[in-house]
């Protein structure tokens, strides 16, 4: 799985940061210290960490991921990363 999306609600100085969904690499989610949750009303699960995005991006960079793009959608910030 070379692509990864992470997101956070505005304020990006604090967590939580969403780092994956139910199809994400379990080993990578464990490395990030992510917990799996299901939000009431959603029919899917997501992995999140309490770290701010900067900490998550630093951890992912050390694992070989690079940011391809970043955007804001409403009050959500999203980063797309890729690993060669």
From Swiss-Prot:
Keywords, comma-separated and alphabetical: Cytoplasm, Membrane, Nucleus
InterPro entries in UniProt: GFRP_sf (IPR036717), GTP_CycHdrlase_I_reg (IPR009112)
Pfam families the UniProt entry points to: GFRP
Molecular function GO terms recorded: GTP cyclohydrolase binding
GO cellular component terms, semicolon-separated: cytoplasm; cytosol; nuclear membrane; nucleus
Recorded superkingdom: Eukaryota
Residue ranges of coiled coil: none
Gene3D superfamilies: GTP cyclohydrolase I feedback regulatory protein GFRP (3.30.1410.10)
Compartments where located: Nucleus; Nucleus membrane; Cytoplasm, Cytosol
Keyword presence, Cell inner membrane: no
Any GO BP: negative regulation of biosynthetic process
Principal cellular location given in the protein's record: nucleus
Function statement: Mediates tetrahydrobiopterin inhibition of GTP cyclohydrolase 1. This inhibition is reversed by L-phenylalanine.
Family, similarity comment: Belongs to the GFRP family.
Subunit description: Homopentamer. Forms a complex with GCH1 where a GCH1 homodecamer is sandwiched by two GFRP homopentamers. Interacts with GCH1.
Name the UniProt record assigns to this protein: GTP cyclohydrolase 1 feedback regulatory protein
Organism field: Bos taurus (Bovine)
Gene: GCHFR
């Amino acid at each position: 799985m070379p692509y990864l999306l992470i997101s956070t609600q505005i304020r990006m100085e604090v967590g939580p940061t969403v780092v994956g969904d139910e199809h994400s690499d379990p080993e990578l989610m464990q490395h990030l210290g992510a917990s799996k949750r299901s939000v009431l009303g959603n029919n899917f699960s997501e992995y999140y960490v309490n770290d701010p995005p900067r900490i998550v991006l630093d951890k992912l960079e050390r694992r070989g991921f690079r940011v391809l793009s970043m955007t804001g959608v409403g009050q959500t910030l999203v980063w797309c990363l890729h690993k060669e």
